[in-house]
From Swiss-Prot:
The chain crosses the membrane at residues 4-24, 42-62, 69-89, 93-113, 131-151, 158-178, 217-237, 247-267, 271-291, 295-315, 328-350, 355-377. One of its GO terms (molecular function) is transmembrane transporter activity. It is found in: Cell inner membrane. GO terms for cellular component: plasma membrane. HAMAP family: MFS_MdtL. This is Multidrug resistance protein MdtL. Its main location: membrane. It comes from Salmonella dublin (strain CT_02021853). It comes from the Bacteria. The gene is mdtL. It is a multi-pass membrane protein.
Length: 395
């Protein structure tokens, strides 16, 4: 079991590392490529577009050909794309490399969740996904620090050499440590209930959890997107104060994420999901009534706590009905989360909604819709029947 957890964690970490590792070198990259920082900031959107593109295909390929081949190819693509970015001499080539990086990271991301669905039951999966969420919260804090230390002695290209090395390590883990977990054979009595036709992506329970996780990701990405404006322009923080504040909020996310597995031993998953949405609602109300920086910071802290306590549980429930189509389900969740959150941020910007109101709106909207879905759509018997562990059921 340890090999699956190690490989899944490594596969997921390529995604946040690809976002955060290079940011510290952005001014120097812009100068060397004769591009403005504003022009290169689109690299974030290009990276997410690459991830979404990979997710369109990676899940189905993983279900048909196996998790291991997709993981290996994804790691190789990420490694080669990182080298392409390091060799870029102008902006368009750099952005092409970023798009390919997103494709590699997206394939690995999808496979990681499919592996966890294949090897863990619902209770253990919820705990592991919560831990995984905590680990991914460490990357936005550590990656810029590591990047800064690297650039003290080496040029910005070394940041992408480091990411390329990460791709090599993940590829080697996938090649030599990871075992194939894709279900290859079911007992005859299970064929009818576990067929791809039965594992529908439009069943009410999956759609409800897809909506909850998409709204939750929209909350956290809106917070990340709006935080520079809120903290530095509205609240008057310096860059140093901003960095410290974001590090502290990441710390809150880590503490709550690492505590959630223990909470799952005491409370039902539904209870933790309701707590999560209750924290979102409280955060929205707090921010709407806040008149001091202290109260605003308290509201922002509630956002991080709410996301960390509920997201892993909701993702585990969403993957639960799928024993044969875990890859497709993981892809669908990833695409919905990336596209849904991007659509909200884009619409809010087009409509001229302020950063604070954008955040308050998604917090209150997410909490109300999610609470209604949690109460109205509960796991039924057919969902429980699909909750099998294909890898463990092999002879």
């Amino acid at each position: 079991m340890k090999r699956f957890l190690l490989c899944s964690f490594a596969l997921v970490l390529l995604y946040p590392a690809g976002i955060d590792m290079y940011l510290v070198g952005l001014p120097r990259i812009a100068a060397d490529l004769n591009a403005s920082e504003a022009q290169l900031h689109i690299a974030f959107s290009v990276y997410l577009a690459g991830m979404a593109t990979a997710m369109l295909f990676a899940g189905k390929i993983a279900d048909q050909s196996g998790r291991k081949p997709v993981a290996i190819v994804g790691a190789i693509v990420f490694m080669m794309a990182s080298l392409l970015c390091s060799r870029a001499s102008e902006g368009s080539l750099f952005l092409s490399g970023r798009f390919l990086q997103g494709i590699g990271a997206g394939g690995c991301y999808v496979v990681a969740f499919a592996i966890l669905r294949d090897t863990l039951d619902e209770h253990r999966r919820a705990k592991v996904l919560s831990l995984l969420n905590g680990i991914t919260c460490i990357v936005p804090v550590l990656a810029p620090v590591v990047g800064h230390l690297i650039m003290l002695r080496f040029p910005w290209q070394s940041l992408f050499y480091t990411m390329s090395a990460m791709g090599i390590i993940v590829g080697l883990l996938s090649l030599f440590i990871l075992r194939e977990t894709r279900p290859v054979r079911l007992a005859p009595r299970d064929l009818s209930r576990s067929s791809p036709a039965a594992e529908s992506l439009i069943n009410r329970f999956f759609v409800s959890r897809l909506a909850i996780t998409t709204l939750s990701v929209s909350v956290i990405l809106t917070f990340v997107n709006a935080s520079p404006v809120l903290l530095m322009e509205v609240m008057g923080f310096s860059r140093g104060d901003y960095a410290i504040t974001m590090a502290l909020t990441a710390g809150v996310s880590m503490v709550v994420s690492f505590s959630t597995p223990f909470a799952l031993g005491l409370f039902k998953p539904r209870t933790l999901m309701l707590v999560s949405q209750g924290l979102f609602l409280t955060a929205g109300v707090t921010l709407s009534l806040a008149h001091t920086n202290t109260v605003t910071l308290f509201g922002l802290t509630l956002i991080c706590a709410g996301f960390s306590v509920g997201f892993g549980v909701a993702m585990s429930q969403a993957l639960g009905p799928f024993s044969l189509r875990a890859g497709v389900a993981s892809s669908t969740l990833g695409i919905a989360q990336v596209c849904g959150s991007s659509l909200w941020i884009w619409l809010a910007a087009i409509l001229g909604i302020s950063a604070m109101n954008m955040l308050i709106g998604i917090l209150i909207g997410c909490s109300i819709v999610s609470i209604l879905l949690i109460f109205s759509v509960t796991p039924n018997r057919s969902v429980a029947e699909h909750e099998e562990i294909p890898y463990q059921s092999r002879p």
